[in-house]
Swiss-Prot record:
<dbReference type="Pfam" id="PF00994">
    <property type="entry name" value="MoCF_biosynth"/>
</dbReference>
<dbReference type="InterPro" id="IPR050101">
    <property type="entry name" value="CinA"/>
</dbReference>
<dbReference type="Pfam" id="PF02464">
    <property type="entry name" value="CinA"/>
</dbReference>
<dbReference type="InterPro" id="IPR036425">
    <property type="entry name" value="MoaB/Mog-like_dom_sf"/>
</dbReference>
<dbReference type="InterPro" id="IPR041424">
    <property type="entry name" value="CinA_KH"/>
</dbReference>
<protein>
    <recommendedName>
        <fullName>Putative competence-damage inducible protein</fullName>
    </recommendedName>
</protein>
<dbReference type="Pfam" id="PF18146">
    <property type="entry name" value="CinA_KH"/>
</dbReference>
<dbReference type="InterPro" id="IPR036653">
    <property type="entry name" value="CinA-like_C"/>
</dbReference>
<comment type="similarity">
    <text>Belongs to the CinA family.</text>
</comment>
<dbReference type="InterPro" id="IPR008136">
    <property type="entry name" value="CinA_C"/>
</dbReference>
<dbReference type="InterPro" id="IPR001453">
    <property type="entry name" value="MoaB/Mog_dom"/>
</dbReference>
<dbReference type="InterPro" id="IPR008135">
    <property type="entry name" value="Competence-induced_CinA"/>
</dbReference>
Length: 411
């Protein structure tokens, strides 16, 4: 079946808000085995909304809209769908009671306008909103399925997964299951070359690489009569990928690098502290994303100036004068210094030129040195990271987290 996404909202059209809903829905429908050929964004204009809605209905079997279910006069998605199917909007008391309950819970008074959110096209299936005041609905008629969802991602995601996916199961031909392997430390072309025969000869399951910021993902997808059978098809392919890419595969699904490292540090009872210059606390911020990291993360120091490096970390003045702040020698002393002062098993440091200015011929923008002290033994690495200031910093942090992960695998 063909699916089309229609996102409603002037704020999306003008780029004021990033349209993450379309990305989320496209991935979900793809994982379920539906085909998608069109997406559209339309502002809060009723005539243009009607035209786009009719175009979508004529092209697709399933049309999903996001937004336009609010209480204001320009929230007209339900009205547009009801008019197309020649249906009345009917008041649904249970939904209204849930809206009232939501307002009571957050200590706010409900306005008369919010009553509008409890009106739905006659005969539709109502989708409960567990995280907001705008319930969704499904109109399933004349060989067309129209799914109306609210705009906020925090409301769409649980509504889609809890209510829409179960509803659409009857339209799936068999079961499609995907497993995502996350890879870092190797580029998309290099990883794809190592798996070339698997990619070239794929049937069921299929395997597809996707380049993302600082990493690559491989989605393995199988189609079968049941989820259990599909997973059995995926397993041999996953084994082959892992055998070839080895420790470059760091996780599955939505697992992040910091999740993996955090779990390893806790399991191995290894404490860690950070000393950052060019990354300015970004590394420690990533590490503390992992719940429970307080067991092993002792502290993070942002030592931007030479004085801070000397006073806080014990970096020698002679080192800074002879080699400069951006050097392997300084990175080594920073890592050793933070491990010593924090009393941790691991100390890690970053020092470099993030840009856009400050670079020289000898030390250009993107040059970064990182240091790693594990149980008193110090190593350093030289990195050359392309991109703007934020990109350089993000890439350095990813590289450092991955480096620590690889170093402690066999400890």
């Amino acid at each position: 079946m063909k699916v089309e996404i229609l996102c409603v909202g002037t704020e999306l059209l003008l780029g004021d808000i990033l349209n993450t809903n379309a990305q989320f829905l496209a991935k979900e429908f793809g994982a379920m085995g539906f085909s998608m050929y069109h997406q559209a964004v339309v502002g809060d204009n009723v005539e243009r909304l009607k035209r786009e809605f009719e175009l979508a209905i004529n092209r697709a079997d399933i049309v999903v809209t996001t937004g336009g279910l609010g209480p204001t006069d320009d929230d007209l998605t339900k009205e547009t769908a009801a008019e197309y199917f020649n249906k009345k909007l009917i008041f649904h008391k249970e939904s209204y009671d849930e809206i009232v309950k939501f307002f009571n819970k957050i200590g706010k008074e409900i306005s008369e306008n919010n009553k509008k959110q409890a009106y739905f096209p006659e005969g539709c299936t109502i989708l409960k909103n567990d995280h907001g005041t705008a319930p969704g609905c499904i109109i399933d008629e004349n060989d067309k399925v129209v799914i109306l969802l609210p705009g906020p991602p925090r409301e769409i995601i649980p509504m889609f997964r809890n209510y829409v996916i179960p509803y659409l199961r009857k339209y799936q031909e068999g079961t499609i299951v995907s497993k995502v392997l996350r890879v870092c430390g190797i580029g998309e072309s290099g990883a794809a070359e190592m798996l070339k025969d698997l990619i070239d000869n794929q049937t069921n399951p299929t395997i597809a690489p996707y380049a993302k910021d600082n990493e690559v993902t491989f989605r393995i997808t199988a189609k079968a009569e049941s989820e259990e059978v599909a997973m059995k098809l995926i397993e041999p392919m996953e084994r082959k990928v892992r055998e070839r890419l080895k420790e470059n595969v760091y996780g599955v699904g939505d697992t992040s690098l910091e999740d993996v490292l955090g779990a390893m540090l806790i399991e191995k009872k290894l404490t860690i502290a950070t000393a950052e210059s060019c990354t300015g606390g970004l590394l420690s911020g990533r590490l503390i994303n992992y719940p429970g990291i307080s067991e092993v993360f002792m502290e993070g120091a942002v030592t931007y100036s030479n004085e801070a490096k000397m006073n806080r970390l014990g970096v020698k003045k002679e080192t800074l004068e002879s080699y400069g702040a951006v050097s392997s020698e300084t990175a080594a002393e920073m890592a050793k210094g933070i491990a010593k002062t924090a009393g941790t098993n691991i100390g890690v440091s970053t020092t470099g030129v993030a840009g856009p200015g400050g670079g020289t011929k000898e030390k250009p923008v993107g040059l970064v040195y990182v240091g790693l002290c594990i149980n008193g033994k110090v190593k350093t690495r030289k990195l050359n990271m392309p991109g703007d200031r934020q990109t350089v910093r993000n890439r350095v942090v990813n590289a450092v987290i991955d480096w620590i992960r690889r170093e402690i695998i066999n400890l």
